[in-house]
């Protein structure tokens, strides 16, 4: 045992001599893989066996492992090794051995025809790979030969065994072609050869399928074989007889699944639409399945109904345009559409009672697109036929979207509820799309139904029906501009009449109100009809998401109409926040809603509400600042800081966001005096510093503090100016004590907004120099532990160069050290950090001429940068980053041409750099290409992509075909 493990260990490490790959050692390794309880030994054996499979010795041992006295596991490995050698190492085989390899493969398949099925399949795959490698020149009639050899009467295997073995071989042949690694030009030749060879396959399949004496196992194999071959894009008319036979086989329960798969694959081939006559012949066959479909639905046979639906949808969805064009056959196509409608409306609740209806939704998109793509006159004709169909579809979809009874829904698993939620979203998307076909009449239709339902005194309505109709409105109103609609006022009037006794209905009422918030902004008189419902729902934790998101939408869209309701909204919101009814994320949304609301108030009113809203939190924060740090306190601090951040994110009394809304927007006059947010921030600044002093080493707290100021800066812009000096001072102290990425991100915001203003340049320059100095010290200690800090630092440097290059002219800035650290950052394993570093260099290099210190350091250390870039392209960095490195090369070429032309030749001189796979000619070509291209950045990116593939040995492989 020890001896074996030593051998396997050595082989696993790549140190074993080739002689170790013997039959005996392979068998021992397989025994270890299957039966050794030690997982490390299993992994070791697996690694060794993978090496054995690709070794030259595999040609020898694979045949020996197939001997009759071996167990199936060993035989399977032998067959797999044979397949790997044939498919990947075909060039190893001398031409004169092709025939013996072929004959030996046939012999083994014949022997295993009555043996292990998994071994038989692997051997068939191996022979299929061999055939593909030899076709068409070395083996021009491969498929016909296979059929002839297996039909020979002198075989020792019984006819059924031979038949099944042949069918297995014919089945895997197209599958192996689809996954083969054949070069593109060979693939075309082999595909053409196989298309011709199907003439030897289909008559055999037809005969076996229609022969009454064929056993079920053979017929099933025939259908699978046909299914495999049609994916080679065989002309649909050549498949006609087999498709008809497959339709007949649908009546046999044992053959049903295989028949469905074969029919769907045949119909779904992209080329099939060319054969319109064949498609027209298929419609009656599909329509002939309606009785079987109805019976299946009646008997709760989900598998059968699912399969028949797949067939109908495959025909309708893939060929609706071709079939619509056949005007004289419009009635048969309409019958197919109605059959698909039946599948859409199949009884029962998805996904518990049925899983079929979801298959049909894409068909309705396709049909609508095809109808609307016709020229106006033809479209009008089809609209006349299909508008009633689409109105019926809306009714069907809304019925399918209905919730089950509360009792039934209570028994559903969480997974079933989630699937139903996704299904309803799909229905919502479909309704939104159908609106394009039906227009305003669809809204009127929904409104009439809802009105009749809510005002009828004859019978009590179900909440499910009401909810579904509202859901239809919501689906459309969320994405379509319904401001012109004459039914929305009536709908808003109906909503308060809805008797809400159910969470799902209440949720949909909320979301519908939210979807109509833009309409409410244009019709403020209606706000009072629905706002009380929303505020009432805020107090229900089960309606947390819907009520808070709806209030946020109303506050955002209708903020200039809300001052009369502001006191009530703030009071209700404060109450639910204090009672902790909502989860953290909803609390944050609620604060954003209040930020929108307060933005529209006069300054005095704003400050009054603001103090009322946050005073409790400030008191809690003061108390927490006095206490010894502990985990529960940290959660509370981060929560309070998060609430303030989200409030300040949207509290914009200067209405900066509205600047993009257009001149027609009703704006309040810009208030005079200090900004309320700045007033509050100045009041709590000392408190925040006190909190920081105790939590400075905690990244989450520091991040939460920075978020308050970062979001305030983004919202307030120039209004934040009074805070700049003290914030710069605080950030400097924070970063000097414990460097954190969030502090650098906030510094970047300050540079972006205020660095260009002379009054603010001194504190920002001081902060920039300080954080740069601290970060450079971090590089000396070992920056690899802080990729987030390096990432943020590189982004800060790039922003400084972009916004205020003067920051790089300061004598106290060590530009050389910054440059060297950025080169080091290019070698980080983290992609975002590398990307940020590349971004810094693409901003720095254009400044060579205007900033003396930058020009000097590029002249001295630019070669080091180029080598780092070439190393990355040579294989040290991810291929996804090549565009970023190409940007650096382009910038070097554009702004430092004379230096680059000297450096690149020197850098590429050493053998094996940047990759041992490159020839001197390839390196020379690359350098010349780069130096020639100083205008077209896209071309440089293409050159770099080509070069990196050469460096990695991937050029011209299928692996990089889409790269």
UniProtKB/Swiss-Prot annotation:
Keywords recorded for this protein, A-Z: Cytoplasm, Nucleus, Protein transport, Repeat, Transport
Which residue range or ranges hold the Importin N-terminal domain?
45-111
Keyword Transferase attributed: no
State the HEAT repeat positions: 24-54, 56-88, 95-135, 142-179, 194-231, 236-268, 276-325, 330-372, 375-438, 440-476, 487-522, 524-558, 562-600, 603-648, 676-716, 720-754, 761-803, 815-845, 860-893, 897-931
Cellular component per GO? cytoplasm; NLS-dependent protein nuclear import complex; nucleus
Query: Which intervals of the chain form a coiled coil?
Result: none
Q: Which Gene3D superfamilies match?
A: Leucine-rich Repeat Variant
Q: Name one GO biological process term.
A: protein import into nucleus
Superkingdom, natural source? Eukaryota
The record's tissue-specificity note reads:
Expressed in fetal brain, heart, intestine and kidney.
Q: What induces it?
A: By cortisol.
Provide an example Pfam family for this protein: Importin_rep
**Does the keyword Protein transport belong to this entry?**
yes
Q: Which GO terms describe its molecular function?
A: nuclear glucocorticoid receptor binding; small GTPase binding
Protein location: Cytoplasm; Nucleus
The task this protein performs is described as: Functions in nuclear protein import as nuclear transport receptor. Serves as receptor for nuclear localization signals (NLS) in cargo substrates. Is thought to mediate docking of the importin/substrate complex to the nuclear pore complex (NPC) through binding to nucleoporin and the complex is subsequently translocated through the pore by an energy requiring, Ran-dependent mechanism. At the nucleoplasmic side of the NPC, Ran binds to the importin, the importin/substrate complex dissociates and importin is re-exported from the nucleus to the cytoplasm where GTP hydrolysis releases Ran.
Q: Could you describe the subunit structure of this protein?
A: Interacts with UBC9, RAN, RBM8A, eIF-1A and PAX6.
Q: Indicate the family of this protein.
A: Belongs to the importin beta family.
Please identify the protein, giving its name as recorded: Importin-13
Cite the source lineage: Eukaryota, Metazoa, Chordata, Craniata, Vertebrata
């Amino acid at each position: 045992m020890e001896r074996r493990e030593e051998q396997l260990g050595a082989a696993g490490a790549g140190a074993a001599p080739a002689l170790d790959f013997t039959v005996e050692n392979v068998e021992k390794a397989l025994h270890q893989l299957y039966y050794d309880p030690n997982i490390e030994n299993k992994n070791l054996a697996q690694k060794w066996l993978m090496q054995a499979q690709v070794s030259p010795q595999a040609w020898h041992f694979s045949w020996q492992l197939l001997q009759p006295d071996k167990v199936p596991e060993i035989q399977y490995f032998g067959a797999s090794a044979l397949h790997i050698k044939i498919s990947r190492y075909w060039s190893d085989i001398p031409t004169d051995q092709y025939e013996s390899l072929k004959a030996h493969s046939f012999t083994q398949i014949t022997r295993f025809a009555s043996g292990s099925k998994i071994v038989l399949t692997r051997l068939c795959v191996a022979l299929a790979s061999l055939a593909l490698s030899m076709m068409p020149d070395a083996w021009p009639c491969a498929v016909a030969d296979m059929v002839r050899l297996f039909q020979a009467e002198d075989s020792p295997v019984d006819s059924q065994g031979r038949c099944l073995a042949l069918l297995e071989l014919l089945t895997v042949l197209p599958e192996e072609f689809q996954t083969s690694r054949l070069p593109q030009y060979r693939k075309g030749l082999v595909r053409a050869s196989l298309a011709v060879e199907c003439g030897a396959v289909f008559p055999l399949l037809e005969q076996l399928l229609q022969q009454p004496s064929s056993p079920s196992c053979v017929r099933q194999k025939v259908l699978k074989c046909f299914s495999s071959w049609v994916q080679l894009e065989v002309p649909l008319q050549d498949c006609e007889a087999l498709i008809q036979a497959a339709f007949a086989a649908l009546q046999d329960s044992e053959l049903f699944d295989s028949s469905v798969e074969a029919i769907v694959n045949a119909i779904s081939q992209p080329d099939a639409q060319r054969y319109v006559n064949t498609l027209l012949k298929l419609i009656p066959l599909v329509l002939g399945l309606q009785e079987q479909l109805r019976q299946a639905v009646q008997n709760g046979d989900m598998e059968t109904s699912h399969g028949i639906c797949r067939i109908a949808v495959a025909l309708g969805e893939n060929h609706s345009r071709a079939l619509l064009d056949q005007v004289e056959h419009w009635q048969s196509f309409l019958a197919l559409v109605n059959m698909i409608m039946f599948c859409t409306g199949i009884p029962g609740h998805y996904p518990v009672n049925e899983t079929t209806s979801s298959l049909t939704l894409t068909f309705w998109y396709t049909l609508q697109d095809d109808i609307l793509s016709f020229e106006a006159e033809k479209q009008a004709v089809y609209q006349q036929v299909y508008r009633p169909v689409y109105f019926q579809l809306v009714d069907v979809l809304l019925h399918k979207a209905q919730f089950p009874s509360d009792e039934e829904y209570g028994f559903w698993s969480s997974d079933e509820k989630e699937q139903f939620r996704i299904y309803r979203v799909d229905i919502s998307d479909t309704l939104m799309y159908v609106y394009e076909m039906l227009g305003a009449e669809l809204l009127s239709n929904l409104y009439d139904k809802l009105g009749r339902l809510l005002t009828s005194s004859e019978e009590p309505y179900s909440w499910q029906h009401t909810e579904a109709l509202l859901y239809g409105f919501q689906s459309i109103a969320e994405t379509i501009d319904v401001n012109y609609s004459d039914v929305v006022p009536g709908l808003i009037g109906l909503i308060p009449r809805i008797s809400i006794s159910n969470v799902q209905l209440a949720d949909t009422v909320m979301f519908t109100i939210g979807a109509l918030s833009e309409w409410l902004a244009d019709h403020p008189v209606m706000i009072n009809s629905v706002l009380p419902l929303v505020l009432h729902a805020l107090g229900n934790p089960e309606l947390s998401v819907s009520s808070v998101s709806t209030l946020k939408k109303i506050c955002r869209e209708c903020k200039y109409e809300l001052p009369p309701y502001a006191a009530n909204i703030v009071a209700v919101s404060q109450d639910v926040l204090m009672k902790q009814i909502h989860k953290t994320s909803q609390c944050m949304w609620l604060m954003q809603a209040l930020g929108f609301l307060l933005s529209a108030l006069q300054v005095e009113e704003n400050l009054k509400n603001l103090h009322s809203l946050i005073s409790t939190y400030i008191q809690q924060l003061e108390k927490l600042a006095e206490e010894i740090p502990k985990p529960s306190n940290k959660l509370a601090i981060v929560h309070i800081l998060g609430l303030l951040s989200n409030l300040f994110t949207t509290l914009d009394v200067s209405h900066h966001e509205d600047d993009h809304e257009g001149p027609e927007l009703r704006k309040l006059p810009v208030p005079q005096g200090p900004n309320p947010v700045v007033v509050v921030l100045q009041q709590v600044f000392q408190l925040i510093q006190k909190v920081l002093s105790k939590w400075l080493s905690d990244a989450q707290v520091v991040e939460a503090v920075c978020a308050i100021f970062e979001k305030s800066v983004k919202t307030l812009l120039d209004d934040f100016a009074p805070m700049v000096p003290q914030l710069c001072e605080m950030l400097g102290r924070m970063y000097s004590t414990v460097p954190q990425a969030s502090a650098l991100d906030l510094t970047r915001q300050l540079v972006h907004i205020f660095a260009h203003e002379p009054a603010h340049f001194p504190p920002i320059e001081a902060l920039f120099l300080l954080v740069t100095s601290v970060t450079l010290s971090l590089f000396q200690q070992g920056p690899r532990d802080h990729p987030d800090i390096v990432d943020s630092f590189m982004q800060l440097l790039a922003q400084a160069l972009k916004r205020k290059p003067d920051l790089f002219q300061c004598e106290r800035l060590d530009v050389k050290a910054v440059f060297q650290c950025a080169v080091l950052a290019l070698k980080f394993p983290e992609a975002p950090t590398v990307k940020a570093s590349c971004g810094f260099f693409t901003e720095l290099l254009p400044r060579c001429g205007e900033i003396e210190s930058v020009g000097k350091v590029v002249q001295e250390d630019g070669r080091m940068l180029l080598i780092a870039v070439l190393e990355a392209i040579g294989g040290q960095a991810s291929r996804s980053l090549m565009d970023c490195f190409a940007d650096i090369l382009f910038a070097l070429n554009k702004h430092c041409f004379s230096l680059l032309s000297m450096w690149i030749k020197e850098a590429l001189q050493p053998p094996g750099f940047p990759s041992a796979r490159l020839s001197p000619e390839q390196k020379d070509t690359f350098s010349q290409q780069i130096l020639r291209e100083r205008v077209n950045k896209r071309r440089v990116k293409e050159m770099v992509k080509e070069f990196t593939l050469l460096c990695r040995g991937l050029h011209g492989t299928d692996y990089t075909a889409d790269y």
